[in-house]
């Protein structure tokens, strides 16, 4: 924090007190993205994660960026029976240059929500199932892969289906 400020980077710090009951609030990338003048809100599986979408933070962003468009169209999936989710850039690993979204499908990343988001953002979805060393689903894609401008890091062995693994690796090549 201090190092960034020393470099002249403006930081707006929002604290999450115990009263907020949001222990995972240090991961705001799961409930929103900010890109091209749009604040996109994502449906979250756990109720305490939904509490992170604080109105004071959203209002601050709207005040700071008067032309900001708030897109909450995906939040309706939280209210469906059964509910469906897509936890932001925890679930979505986006290659912005190639316009591809890699998504490990899980209880926190439902294919229907992925398809709608990708269509709206002009992204090609590449979905797959990923498992940890004990055979449990990996719930956020960003724990098993990352895509940067000139390099990608992926734990290919976690992609359960060999055909899916090949599809992901080919897309990254």
Protein language model regions, located:
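The feature marks the mature, well-folded catalytic cores of soluble enzymes
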Residues: 1-173
């Amino acid at each position: 924090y201090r190092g960034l400020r020393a470099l002249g980077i403006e930081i707006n710090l929002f604290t999450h007190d115990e009263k907020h009951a949001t222990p995972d609030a240090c991961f705001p990338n799961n409930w929103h993205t900010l890109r091209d003048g749009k604040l996109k809100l994502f449906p979250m599986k756990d109720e305490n994660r939904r509490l992170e979408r604080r109105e004071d933070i959203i209002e601050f962003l709207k005040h700071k960026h008067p032309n900001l468009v708030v897109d909450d169209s995906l939040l309706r999936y939280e209210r469906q029976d059964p509910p469906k989710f897509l936890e932001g850039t925890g679930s979505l690993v986006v290659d912005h240059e190639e316009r591809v979204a890699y998504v490990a499908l899980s209880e926190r990343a439902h294919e229907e929500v992925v398809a709608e988001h990708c269509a709206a953002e002009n992204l090609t979805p590449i979905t797959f199932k990923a498992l940890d060393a004990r055979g449990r689903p990996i719930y956020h894609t960003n724990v098993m892969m990352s895509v940067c401008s000139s390099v990608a890091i992926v734990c290919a062995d976690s992609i359960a289906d060999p055909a899916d693994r090949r599809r992901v690796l080919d897309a990254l090549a």
